[in-house]
C-alpha cells in the first residue's frame, strides 16, 4: 500500500514544523504491535505489558570479548528483575509472567564510533558487535529464565533514550549523536527561576583530551543538515533490535533553507523509504 497519502503528508508537515506527531510503523511483520511507552522503545500486542529495561555503556568496553561477557551478565540481571520488581496491578503481573519482556539497551554508541574514527553510520566493526549483542542477549536470557522456571522472553532488546543516566555515565545517550561540542544549558532553581550555563559537552571534552580533533567530532547539529544519515543509521541498527529504538532526529528550524514547505515532499518520501525497517520515528526542529 502506498503510504504517500495526503494524511501522511500533513503529518510530516506538522512534524517538520513542531516536532509532533511522532510516527509508529505497525505494518508488514509489525502488524498489530503498538509503541507502548512515551519514549517509544517498547512494542507489544498486550495493553498491560511491561518491560524490564537497562542499558550497557558501549563506550567503556574495549573488546568484543568483554562486550559479550557484559551483555550476558546484563541480560541475566534483567531476568532477575522479572521476579523482584513490583508492578501496580494483578493484570499487569499476569502479562509480565506470560511475556517476561526484557529491553537490554545500549548507550554511548556515538562515543564508541568516534573513539574508533568512524562516522555516524553502520560499519563492519559495529556489525560484529551488534551481532554479539543480538545473539548473547537472547542466549543468556533464555538460559536464566529456564533456570528460574520463567517463561522465555517475548522480547530482549530495546534502545531507550538514556538521557539522564548517560549524563551520569559521562557518555552519549542511546543511539543519539553528541548534541553539540558546546551548548547553553538551562536549569530551574527553587522551582521558580531559570538559570543558564555554557558548557562543553563532557563526552566531546573527553574525546578531545584523548587526542581527537574537534573538527572530527560530528554532532547532532552537524547531522541536522543531513537527516537521511540519521534515519538510515537508525534503520540499520533496528535490524538487531526486536523491540524499538528511541531516537529524535534533530532538524533545522521550520522556515529555514533546509526545512520549509518546499521540503515536505522530500521528507515524506525519505520517511516512506525507510519506514519498512523502522518501528518508530521522531523529529524535532
Label every PLM stretch briefly.
Residues 22-24, 121-122, 283:
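Acidic/polar loop patches that form or flank catalytic/metal-binding clefts of enzymes
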Residues 12-116, 182-191, 278:
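Function-dense linear segments that define catalytic or interfacial modules
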Residues 7, 49, 70, 74-77, ...:
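General structural feature for long, well-ordered alpha-helical segments within catalytic domains
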Residues 35-47, 54, 78-86, 159-161, ...:
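Catalytic alpha/beta core of large soluble enzyme barrels
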Residues 75-93, 97, 108, 113-165, ...:
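Internal maturation/activation junctions in enzymes
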Residues 1-16:
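Polar, glycine-rich mid-to-C-terminal structural blocks
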